[in-house]
């Protein structure tokens, strides 16, 4: 088991968790925590959204996951988990691909009792270029079986399943999925960067169609062409408008995760969010 540079007990940290820093999650792959970022997250009082990918699942054992979980939970940090997604297809018409996808998701679900996360974020996985036409219903039926299993498994541990947009062109490609999952506790994770880079519908249309079902936000910016994961304000997204519209639909804030991909971009994200936070 890899040694971590942080004690498991006590509250630790170099700053008091106040303001916006205590209201948001910050994304971080589990492998990065094990390779040095754990100490920074503890020192800065950050609430993590921990990415669980194939590398983490294959490299580390239960003891590694349990120890990292204890370090955060003993310090009163809230945790969210992001399930594996690369090369996975939760609605695949290929039985072997579907089986492998469900196996990887099940491996992530097994970690829920360790981390006690608020949410488990999964990619909904629809792409009209691959699953359009007659394959749409096959994709939907397989997806529903996949997500009902996951939602049922995690609900007893107090975690909420949230499904995130990636290549979906507009909310119309997700509405029937959420309609059919009504009653499972499954909610929508609106990813602002993805709707800008890959979608065709503006943010206000997403919020109008699915705003009441939003349980989580992924906030990052881009210039409208690539999934750059820039600091908020460094791209084309109008975050004051997006959050303002959401606040008119949601009386209390959803879970909010910041997803910059450079360490230097975190503080600018926090500063902007502090200025425009509408709740």
Which residues are covered by each model-predicted region?
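Short, flexible loop segments at the rims of nucleotide/cofactor-binding pockets, characterized by
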Residues: 25-28, 98, 164-166, 194-197, ...
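Charged helix-capping and loop-helix junction motifs
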Residues: 62-67, 98, 102-105, 136-144, ...
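N-terminal pre-domain/capping segments
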Residues: 1-107, 279
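Active-site beta-loop-alpha junctions enriched in small/polar residues
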Residues: 27-31, 51-55, 84-86, 125-127, ...
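Acidic (Asp/Glu)-rich catalytic clusters
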Residues: 37-45, 62-80, 110-116, 152-156, ...
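Active-site acidic/histidine proton-transfer and metal-coordination neighborhood
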Residues: 7, 91-187
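Histidine-acidic metal/acid-base catalytic patches
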Residues: 2-21, 36-39, 91, 171-187, ...
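Hydrophobic faces of well-ordered beta-strands that scaffold small-molecule active sites
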Residues: 22-28, 48-50, 79-81, 120-122, ...
């Amino acid at each position: 088991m890899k040694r971590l540079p942080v004690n498991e007990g006590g509250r630790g940290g170099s700053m008091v968790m106040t303001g916006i820093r205590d209201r948001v999650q910050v994304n971080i792959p589990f492998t990065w925590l094990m390779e040095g970022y754990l100490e920074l997250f503890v020192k800065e009082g950050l609430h993590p959204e921990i990415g669980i990918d194939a590398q983490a699942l294959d490299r580390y054992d239960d003891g590694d996951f349990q120890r990292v979980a204890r370090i955060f939970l003993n310090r009163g940090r809230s945790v969210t988990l992001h399930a594996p997604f690369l090369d996975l297809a939760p609605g695949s018409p290929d039985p072997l691909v579907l089986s492998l996808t469900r196996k990887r998701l099940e491996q992530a679900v097994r970690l829920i009792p360790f981390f006690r996360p608020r949410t488990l974020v999964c990619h909904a996985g629809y792409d009209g270029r691959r699953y359009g036409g007659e394959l749409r219903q096959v994709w939907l039926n397989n997806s529903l079986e996949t997500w009902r299993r996951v939602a049922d498994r995690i609900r007893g541990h107090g975690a909420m399943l949230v499904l995130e947009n990636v290549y979906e062109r507009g909310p119309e490609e997700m509405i029937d999925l959420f309609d059919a999952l009504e009653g499972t506790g499954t909610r929508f994770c609106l990813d602002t960067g993805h709707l800008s880079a890959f979608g065709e519908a503006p943010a206000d249309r997403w919020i109008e169609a699915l705003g009441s079902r939003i349980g989580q936000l992924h906030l990052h910016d881009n210039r409208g062409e690539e999934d750059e994961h820039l600091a908020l304000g460094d791209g084309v997204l109008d975050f004051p408008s997006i959050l303002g519209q959401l606040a008119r639909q949601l009386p209390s804030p959803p879970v909010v995760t910041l997803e910059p991909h450079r360490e230097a971009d975190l503080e600018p994200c926090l500063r902007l969010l502090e200025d425009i936070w509408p709740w």
